UniProtKB/Swiss-Prot annotation:
Summary of the knockout phenotype: Disruption mutant exhibits a partial growth defect under nitrogen limitation when molecular nitrogen is used as the sole nitrogen source.
Stated name of the protein: Nitrogen regulatory protein GlnK1
Induction context: Expressed under nitrogen-limiting conditions.
One Gene Ontology CC term in the entry: cytosol
Binding residues annotated for ATP, in chain numbering: 32, 40-42, 92-95
Pfam families, alphabetized: P-II
Molecular functions per Gene Ontology: ATP binding; enzyme regulator activity
Keywords, sorted A to Z: ATP-binding, Cytoplasm, Nucleotide-binding
Major place of residence: cytoplasm
UniProt miscellaneous comment: Unlike the enteric GlnK proteins, Glnk1 is not covalently modified by uridylylation under nitrogen limitation.
PROSITE patterns noted in UniProt: PII_GLNB_DOM
UniProt subunit comment: Homotrimer. Interacts and forms stable complexes with the glutamine synthetase GlnA1.
Name of encoding gene: glnK1
Residue numbers binding ADP: 32, 40-42, 92-95
Length: 117
């Protein structure tokens, strides 16, 4: 059986279109996109509401989830890095997580494994 990976990327919201364009170039077209909040090196920021300061330490991010066969793993990672970084990259440009994927099942056809991706 061909090995599969589950790629999770956290990126800046304004870089989503660029990441999608890069993924389309390598024919990766099936992905899940979610709006999430979090913080890392950016640490968030202070907000003032009704004369009170609040630590708004959660920043808006985009979470992209993609299941790929091993042959698509490195091109997928490079596409995400290229799109998310832009021309020079910033603190908070994102992170990519790669996890082993044991199985995939397409509910409609009952296909499993790499064919279901």
């Amino acid at each position: 059986m061909v090995a599969m990976k589950y790629v999770i990327a956290m990126i800046r919201p304004e870089r989503l279109d660029a990441v999608k364009r890069e993924l389309q170039k390598i024919e990766v077209s099936r992905l899940t996109v979610s709006s999430v909040s979090g913080y890392g090196a950016q640490k968030g920021y202070m907000e003032i509401y009704r004369a009170m300061e609040y630590d708004a330490n959660l920043l808006e991010k985009i979470k992209i989830e993609i299941a790929v066969n091993d042959e698509f793993l490195e091109p997928t990672i490079e596409a995400i890095k290229t799109g998310a970084k832009g021309s020079d990259g910033y603190v908070g440009s994102g992170k990519i997580f790669v996890l082993p994927l044991e199985n995939v099942i397409r509910i409609r056809t009952n296909e499993t494994g790499p064919e279901a991706i």
